């Protein structure tokens, strides 16, 4: 999987938007993928476990709404 700051941000956003309870470690492992899939399902997106452009845009909106 991917790793780094982008993944850390995504993990933080998934935690806030979904209550995912992920460890923010910057590693896109199985738990992060599962949380991504759950978020995609909730948002009615294609479920692929990958944070592409559309998923990212929805995640940012959901994060901001949860603030």
Predicted features and spans:
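Short acidic, glycine/serine/threonine-rich helix-capping segments at coil-helix boundaries
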Residues: 1-61
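C-terminal extensions
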Residues: 65-67
